[in-house]
């Protein structure tokens, strides 16, 4: 019986190639369905697939056929109704028109084609064409950094990196291969010598010949070296370059008393979407979480999203803390610095000009991109207008948007992080 071993990487998903071709072909339909699903779901409910439906008419293959239009000259058999040269009226139907009618007991049609996309495919369509703007390579004038990683086994190398187990295994295999036939002959000769000593003890000549042959075979086996340079195996270490583009995202969230529970929920959903986007699209990125009311604190992910602490409103406290963290841990010469700020716009009146001054002088010259999201259905307040002045001075690296309801989160997010063409 013969066996077929399938060593393909997608052996259990043999139609993966066809599926990818299908997803590319109907990308517009799927992307539209994903956007509708995002607006329908909770932002915290993004990490699973979606049922996609495509109208049947959109998956039909185009075909060429004869139409029903035009004039045709055809000879039909005569009968008592028609005579030679008369024209026959075109039969009714077949024109593909639509009109009012009643239900019938016959006929057929085609439902929409539905299929399920996976979590990975859903997130791919969800974050398609999004990126962190102005991500550049830092330390262009410095030396690249490398890390040493294992890369298998080599026949050459430094003696300090010798792999003892693989070396002894190779030596053992070589000795078996080179002395295998001699050992087989030795076993046969030894067995024959024992038989002759037992059954023919007087046959001294043959016994002596066998003893000489046995000594010769043992000497041949001993001449096979225990360890040869061919057997030496070394651990292969290679230098792998570290990514030169290092990025950090500062997440600043207002948790003051003016933020209602609904407003805080929208802010958290926005940052959850941002966090999901960063962790999925970028392997090497730091995220710094800052919550603020009258004072600001750097917190971990759990406290950022779930703490109930609240208080008054002084937005500049968060900006000052961000600037201190930048100076201490993230020098702009080495890091691509990003920031996303969410607030309802309420702020102590004298503090809004301070915020603009801190941003203009201490933060914006050193960041790649800064986004401000104001969550309010009301008219904008002083903070928004101060930030508008910043946007005029830093048009390429500063953006601000307004959120009114949870349904605005995804469209605004795409607007802020839409991939930009590089001129």
Swiss-Prot record:
- Biased composition annotated in UniProt, kind: Gly residues: 92-107
Cited InterPro entries? UPF0229 (IPR006698), vWFA_dom_sf (IPR036465)
Q: Where is this region: Disordered?
A: 65-110
Q: Which residues cross the membrane?
A: none
Report the Pfam families cross-referenced here: DUF444
User: Known NCBIfam families for this protein?
Assistant: PRK05325.1-2 (NF003707), PRK05325.1-3 (NF003708)
Tell me its family: Belongs to the UPF0229 family.
- Listed HAMAP family: UPF0229 (MF_01232)
Supply the name of the protein: UPF0229 protein Psyr_4632
Give the species.
Pseudomonas syringae pv. syringae (strain B728a)
